[in-house]
């Protein structure tokens, strides 16, 4: 639809009235519903603000009642904490040093570190015993390539129609 450029006084007055009427409708709507919209916006904004919890001051520790000094009691020895044990053996220092040499963008740093860690066998990296996923996935060895054996005539005989349908396309496509 092309734009009409022939605008006369009648059409210009029509558009002026239409514009003023829409403007008045917007003002009336804002006067009626503006306060409700602002209230909803404030409620949503308040819901989006993070909840501030009151600060709790530490309570003063209560002093324990004085113990009678007639008999010295045995103080239990502190329970030894179990050392933190990760799933993997610690990284050798030579391999760890690769982290700090260069950046990954230049195939150094973290990139070289991860590649050298990947070269280690999982059995030498992990502390826990071999699971079924170790046996199935990591002990299969390299994949064996199988060459596809196919002959052209097998494809032609099995793919193309033998009843002559669409024979007009290419006479070589017809397998008789």
UniProtKB/Swiss-Prot annotation:
UniProt feature, compositional bias: Pro residues: 61-80
- Organism domain of life: Eukaryota
Region Disordered: start and end of each range? 55-80
Q: Which InterPro entries is this protein grouped with?
A: SPMIP1_C
Name of the protein? Protein SPMIP1
Point out the gene that encodes the protein.
Answer: SPMIP1
